[in-house]
Amino acid sequence: MSETFVIVPTYNEADNLDELLEQLLALPDQIGVIVVDDNSPDGTGDMADRWEGLYPGRVYALHRPAKLGLGTAYIAGFNKAIHEVGAERILTMDADFSHNPRYIPDMIALSRSKHVVIGSRYVPGGGTRNCTRKRIYLSRLANFTARALLGLKAKDATAGFRLYRRE
């Protein structure tokens, strides 16, 4: 059984899902995937069902009745990963390749000594894809504010590419 499950919230990601799942399932460490689809009209949910049938126990498709938002998609995915699948590590990422799956083995290795690993956009070697200047500006402002007000050391407190240890 997979110890690490990747939660991938989706809405209209039919153009990306097959390639993303191929890359995730080809990684070492027997990665599992939980696709949380918000009733995508482009067939993303049906694609997730197909993958679930091909890889039972490694791919799960969760279907929600409407576009309910990213936060609740993560909650649904975490509930599945923790309470039903028994994942030891849970990773969150976007389906649009703004987070590169090739970094996941490094994140897993780091998680052996850290409880949370953040795939930061704002460290040497990091970067952004598919983001407008306004979104990057707002993200940097939010991160600066979080560090200043809360004393956080993390460079990218708003990153969606994260790995959490269950414990």
What are these regions, as identified by a protein language model?
Residues D37-D46, A66, F97:
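A conserved acidic beta->alpha catalytic loop
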Residues D15-E19, D42-W51:
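Acidic helix N-cap motif at the loop->helix transition within catalytic regions
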Residues R64-A81, P101-E167:
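Acceptor/aglycone-binding surface of glycosyltransferases and processive sugar-polymer synthases
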Residues G86-S98:
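Short beta-strand-to-loop acidic/aromatic patch adjacent to the donor-nucleotide binding site
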Residues E22-I31:
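Short, acidic, metal-binding catalytic loop of nucleotide-sugar glycosyltransferases
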Residues M1-Q23:
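N-proximal low-complexity "stem/linker" segments adjacent to membrane-targeting elements
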Residues V8, Q30-S40, L62-H63:
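Short beta-strand/loop segment that forms part of the nucleotide-sugar
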Residues V6, V33, A61, I90, ...:
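Hydrophobic/aromatic residues located in beta-strands of well-ordered beta-sheets
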